[in-house]
């Protein structure tokens, strides 16, 4: 296995790449210090080889934190797997400092094993597997205090040294913003010969403070030439379990996701309400695919649109 960058790695594009004291002993030192190869990441070829049997990669993005990217990722994965039992799905949690997928997918306490083909992802269902840095920590309360280069090295290992096998779709749960993790994963997965192999779904809540950052994320994808499948409006309303009436917890003062999608020419995949039953199930890692309510009906519709976009 290739070693991750040193903790104080100056980065591939730094003038000190391969020359700084932190570079001593790094297996990539010679490549980084070569001016003819400095912009050529030595891990790219390893990622390409490892991901050759992964048909599609789907980034779950949002410029704003707390809008439910991780929850939406887990819900989409479960519904896609249930409605497409002959297809294989994977989830990669690249929120390095705040991994949530082990809890959401009911895999807390699981560990990753090494095989001759690399790390084996944790099996969730017969056709779903998961990889997260949460499986590599001694405790769920351990803090990860890493700089960008070390995060990037971890992401590269997840992409190149995990035995993903044959996957029809790999969903990537991302942190907020457009930071090191996003730039790293795009640089490794973007394939100019097959631009449709890497796509994105945006998650937002109805209020303008969220939409403002999602617009930035959409523009990030456009600059990187990443096709956007559509936008999911999460927490669009709250339906009372007693009276059945709906209320807007986050009022859409500027028209919400629908208005933004119309303005920016992006499909609106659907809206998901706040749902107490779903929230409790996610906290305990339960499978929610057998639930029958407004939220699960909306999820079915959203998943159908996502599958159709890959056809």
Swiss-Prot record:
Positions that bind [4Fe-4S] cluster 2: 240, 243
Main location: cytoplasm
GO MF annotations in UniProt: 4 iron, 4 sulfur cluster binding; ATP binding; ATP-dependent FeS chaperone activity; iron-sulfur cluster binding; metal ion binding
Any GO BP annotation: iron-sulfur cluster assembly
Source organism of this protein record: Drosophila erecta
A cellular component term, taken from the record's GO annotations: cytosol
Location(s), subcellular: Cytoplasm
Function: Component of the cytosolic iron-sulfur (Fe/S) protein assembly (CIA) machinery. Required for maturation of extramitochondrial Fe-S proteins. The Nubp1-Nubp2 heterotetramer forms a Fe-S scaffold complex, mediating the de novo assembly of an Fe-S cluster and its transfer to target apoproteins.
Protein name: Cytosolic Fe-S cluster assembly factor Nubp1 homolog
Needed cofactors: [4Fe-4S] cluster
Subunit-level organization: Heterotetramer of 2 Nubp1 and 2 Nubp2 chains.
Positions annotated to bind [4Fe-4S] cluster 1: 9, 23, 26, 32
Residues holding ATP: 63-70
A Pfam family assignment: ParA
Sequence similarity: Belongs to the Mrp/NBP35 ATP-binding proteins family. NUBP1/NBP35 subfamily.
Cofactor: binding comment: Binds 4 [4Fe-4S] clusters per heterotetramer. Contains two stable clusters in the N-termini of Nubp1 and two labile, bridging clusters between subunits of the Nubp1-Nubp2 heterotetramer.
Keywords: 4Fe-4S, ATP-binding, Cytoplasm, Iron, Iron-sulfur, Metal-binding, Nucleotide-binding
């Amino acid at each position: 296995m290739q070693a991750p960058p040193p903790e104080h790695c100056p980065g591939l594009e730094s003038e000190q790449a391969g020359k700084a004291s932190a570079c001593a002993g790094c297996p990539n030192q010679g490549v980084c210090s070569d001016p003819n190869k400095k912009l050529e990441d030595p891990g790219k070829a390893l990622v390409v080889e490892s991901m050759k049997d992964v048909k599609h990669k789907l980034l779950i993005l949002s410029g704003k934190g707390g809008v439910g990217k991780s929850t939406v990722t887990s819900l989409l994965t479960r519904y896609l797997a249930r409605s497409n039992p002959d297809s294989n799905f994977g989830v990669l949690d690249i929120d390095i400092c705040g991994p949530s997928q082990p809890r959401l997918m009911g895999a807390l306490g699981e560990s990753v094993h090494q095989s001759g083909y690399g790390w084996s992802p944790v099996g969730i269902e017969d056709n779903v597997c998961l990889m997260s840095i949460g499986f590599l920590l001694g405790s769920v309360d351990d803090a990860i205090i890493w700089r960008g280069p070390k995060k990037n090295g971890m992401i590269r290992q997840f992409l190149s040294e995990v035995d993903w096998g044959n996957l029809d779709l790999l969903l990537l749960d991302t942190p907020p913003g457009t930071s090191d993790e996003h730039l790293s994963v795009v640089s490794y997965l973007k394939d100019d010969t097959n631009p449709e192999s890497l796509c994105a779904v945006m998650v937002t809540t109805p209020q303008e403070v969220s939409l403002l950052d999602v617009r930035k994320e959409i523009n990030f994808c456009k600059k990187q030439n990443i096709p956007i499948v559509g936008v999911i409006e999460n927490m669009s309303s709250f339906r009372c379990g007693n009276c059945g009436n709906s209320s807007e917890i986050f009022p859409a003062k500027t028209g919400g996701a629908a208005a933004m999608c119309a303005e920016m020419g992006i499909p609106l995949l659907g809206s998901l309400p706040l749902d107490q039953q779903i929230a409790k199930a996610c906290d305990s890692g339960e499978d929610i695919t057998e639930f029958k309510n407004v939220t699960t009906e909306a999820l079915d519709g959203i998943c159908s649109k996502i599958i159709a976009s890959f056809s």
